[in-house]
Amino acid sequence: MSGRCARKGLRFILDAAQTAGLIDIDMTKLRLSALCFSGHKSLYGPQGTGGICLGQGFRPEPLAVGGSGSESFSPTHPTVMPDALEAGTQNAHGIAGLLAGVEYIKNLGGKAFSVAAGHAKRFIKEMKGVEGVTLYGDVDAALRTPVVALNVRGRDSGDIAALLWDDYGIAVRAGAHCAPLMHKTLGTEKIGAVRFSFSHFNTDEEVDAAIAAVKELAK
């Protein structure tokens, strides 16, 4: 993809909202112009945080200007980075929280991903043999995030999520997951999907409980 973009003179911008903090990304190797990430997912920062990492030679124009605080007496917005892209008062406490999350992930190394991926792999293995359970995506991919989307006997995903919480104390996400076009492609635009997101914070016992709960609901 990066090679094609380079040949056409296009910028290659990677959306790492779901992968930042989970999967190693080499911006230089991928020849990325920019990488965009959310802070509140696998980087464990506060909600409302995120950022853009710029590659060499890429300088986007700011979408908003004014109130930088660094050059208050200047009638124009600063041009030095990162001030050029940071208009108004910055979310200092959010940035501090994001920094703490990034440091936590760095200290863990690859442990967080390997544990979470192991949980997801075991969950998928058990779900494959359950009649009435439909799994979505390439569940056999060698490298995938520890997120599993499924449906149970064609029932509304919100109903299944409510039962999982009320009867089993298991928290999942139901609905379209901000991807309505994907659900249209899957044919699930009316019922959505139930999303299990595994983490290194989860225990083997919790994974076992999730497996048992889905099996029971699928009967």
Question: What are the residue ranges of the model-derived segments?
Answer:
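Pyridoxal 5′-phosphate
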Residues: 1-219
